[in-house]
Amino acid sequence: MRRLPHLAGRFWRRRAAFWGGALLVGAVSVLFAQAADGAEHLFFHYDSRFWLAPLLVTPLGYAFCAWAAARVFPGSQGSGIPQAIAAREIPRGMARRRLLSVRMCFAKIGLTVVALMCGASVGREGPTVQVGAAIMLQVARLRGLQNERGLILAGSAAGIAAAFNAPLAGVVFAIEEMSRSFEVKTNGIVLTTVIIGGLVSLGLTGNYTYFGTSNAAIQGLGGWGMVVLCGSAGGLLGGLFSRLMMDIGLWAKSWIAVNRRVRGLAYPAMCGLLVAILGILSQGDSFGTGYATAKAAVEGITPHWYFWPAKFLATLITAVSGIPGGIFAPSLSVGAVSYTHLRAHETVLD
């Protein structure tokens, strides 16, 4: 009986550490979002004054970010979701800690912000998954919590919930992307972390909708036909993107391996140059996250016809360049804008 107060105290200390980790995920996600927005605004500010600047800044930025990700912070490349999935699947040990370390959090946030400052077609939502998973893993290590896999899943879901200000999105993401078999003992951990992270995001940024609001409604068989068409087109584009990303990525690895010292810098610099050229040709539309353009499209403003192919190519090139950054926001912008043109075409036919 004397041990009960001690056990109860340990239980509540662990519980407080868990809640504190969830609060930290939400707060860091909001700060990351603000830093990313500021970096993107800075890029568009100097791009509007010196329209040829991306031809120099973007290749140099890509080369620096790829070099730092490969040599200084290995494991920070790409969106961050594959790293979170891998960390959850591998056994406990140094490999898991390396993928989800505090150092990796700073690297992921910092390099993604630098990439956006250089005009990269990346998003912050994917990196937020790795950051959220890393924070919750550190909580598990510091307080001796045993369920590391469950906390990685919870941190990833909370990251998505805070990034999109949508708690339900975090739960769905946890089931669909991170864990095909949702363990019963993990349910409470995930839900609690998502709710706390979402409330922090709500408290710091207010009640906003990620892509704005729309009064559009599906009407008649023609409207449902457009739903089927958009879904099919989105699936085909997504499949094509994934296939090209894997094939080009494999080719790039073999090409760089011939002379890693020279080609390891030349390859991302060439990717950055291509992104810069696409951005200039598209009047700046393909630079950055694409969030503003997608939000405008949802609210009924039809962007230029060349936005979605330019954004598709810029995002693909960026995804295979080896720099840190997500593909969530750019991919969503491609889908949103391509639909607006299908809708406009339907209106013309009517």
Which residues does each predicted region cover?
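Alpha-helical transmembrane segments and immediately membrane-proximal extracytoplasmic
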Residues: 1-343, 349
